[in-house]
Amino acid sequence: MRVGVLGAKGKVGATMVSAVESAADLTLSAEVDAGDPLSTLTETNTEAVIDFTHPDVVMGNLEFLIDNGIHAVVGTTGFTAERVEQVQSWLAKKPSTAVLIAPNFAIGAVLSMHFAKQAAPFFDSAEIIELHHPQKADAPSGTATRTAKLIAEAREGLAPNPDATSTSLPGARGADVDGIPVHAVRLAGLVAHQEVLFGTQGETLTIRHDSLDRTSFVPGVLLAVRRVRERPGLTIGIEPLLNLQ
């Protein structure tokens, strides 16, 4: 398969360029970065694209890719419900084209989200702390937002988090994502980390994942690239590829 990388000169993008070049069954057809024309992808007969760019440009990228029938594996975050709906609208006009958007491609991170969903109904309280490098554009992270939504779904019908806080500084209790407090840390020296904290009478449970290097995303991205065209339309997350449902 001929694979292009968008955001090829970024830290994650450069890692993906190396990963595709090292994969015997994939051919690196294009390296596209800010200022480069997207037409490079069609001129090089690119079949699938890995996008690690920026929330400000990812929608324009996807519109071009879908219009040209190029499959997309997207690690760029910042996807609101409205953005997802727009992508689905574009895909409806190109039913054979596939887009996979994942908040995280690290296998351990995906498993930690799965474990959090399993644990959620058994605890009274749940909060999330996500920690990333200071260059990250969005907060909270896509992974934390997705984790919070999964926890909220698993706790549907149960009592909300107990919290007697009546006075606080703005933001002191974190962002409220479907009733789950999410706290974002941006600190030099970090890559990507998340703690999910659960508590109930007499015990707590912490589920933590650490990406210590951007190569942690490679196995999940390559899995998605190799299988994306098997799933026309929109897929959210790599859980279906790992049989985690």
Curated annotation (Swiss-Prot):
Q: What is its EC number?
A: 1.17.1.8
**Cellular component terms, GO, for this chain's entry?**
cytosol
Q: Which GO terms describe its molecular function?
A: 4-hydroxy-tetrahydrodipicolinate reductase; NAD binding; NADP binding; oxidoreductase activity, acting on CH or CH2 groups, NAD or NADP as acceptor
Q: Where in the cell is it found?
A: Cytoplasm
Q: Which InterPro entries match?
A: DapB_C, DapB_N, DapB_N_CS, DHDPR_bac, NAD(P)-bd_dom_sf
Enumerate the residues binding NAD(+): 7-12, 75-77, 102-105
Q: Which reaction does it catalyse?
A: (S)-2,3,4,5-tetrahydrodipicolinate + NAD(+) + H2O = (2S,4S)-4-hydroxy-2,3,4,5-tetrahydrodipicolinate + NADH + H(+); (S)-2,3,4,5-tetrahydrodipicolinate + NADP(+) + H2O = (2S,4S)-4-hydroxy-2,3,4,5-tetrahydrodipicolinate + NADPH + H(+)
Q: Which domain of life is it from?
A: Bacteria
Pathway it acts in?
Amino-acid biosynthesis; L-lysine biosynthesis via DAP pathway; (S)-tetrahydrodipicolinate from L-aspartate: step 4/4
Q: What class of enzyme is it?
A: oxidoreductase
Keyword entries, A-Z: Amino-acid biosynthesis, Cytoplasm, Diaminopimelate biosynthesis, Lysine biosynthesis, NAD, NADP, Oxidoreductase
| Active site (UniProt) | 132 (proton donor/acceptor), 136 (proton donor)
Q: Which CDD domains match?
A: DHDPR_N
Among the Pfam families in the record, one is: DapB_N
Principal place where this protein is found?
Answer: cytoplasm
Q: What biological processes does GO assign it?
A: diaminopimelate biosynthetic process; lysine biosynthetic process via diaminopimelate
Q: Which residues bind (S)-2,3,4,5-tetrahydrodipicolinate?
A: 133, 142-143
- What NCBIfam families does the annotation carry? dapB (TIGR00036)
Q: What this chain does, per the record?
A: Catalyzes the conversion of 4-hydroxy-tetrahydrodipicolinate (HTPA) to tetrahydrodipicolinate.
> What family is reported?
Belongs to the DapB family.
What protein name is recorded for this chain? 4-hydroxy-tetrahydrodipicolinate reductase
| UniProt source species | Mycobacterium marinum (strain ATCC BAA-535 / M)
